[in-house]
Amino acid sequence: SFSPIVAINENAAKAHALPSKKRLRRGDLLLLDAGVKFNRYCSDRTRTACFDENFNFGKEQNFKNAKRQEIYEIVKEAQALAIAAVMPGKKANEIDAAARDFIAAQGYGEAFFHSTGHGVGVDIHELPFISKRGEVVLKEGMVFSVEPGIYLPGEFGVRIEDVVVVRENGAEIL
């Protein structure tokens, strides 16, 4: 549904990184943002992982570098808080605030510089926009991404993204 983003180490500090000539090596941080189209509808998912002997794109990661692990855990918790905040009747900016406020409380507010999410449907970016300015009231059946991130220029970036659908009692991860 879009050109994938594949970024290694410091290149992952760019939210919409372009390819570099750097080769992936054991111990590198790898960020992959990709999606497919099925019956005209888009999908979108981002994972950040350590490329080592235990390489996987699951949400549980074990970085040997303590700072990478700390940032990863903050982003993972921010995403969980945002997903837990999803409920019909809430405004999009309330979902954004759940992730953004947590990241800011950990001291990385300035390193999270994009919206928390966007609608996903026939187009990869559509309403509702899950951002500070998002005034859209969530309704059952709305589908959007939840993708907080922390980006440390010259070092690395971490983003975790899932697409959710608003259900009567909260979010369902697709």
What are the residue ranges of the model-derived segments?
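Active-site neighborhoods and metal-handling regions in enzymes and metal-associated proteins
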Residues: 1-174
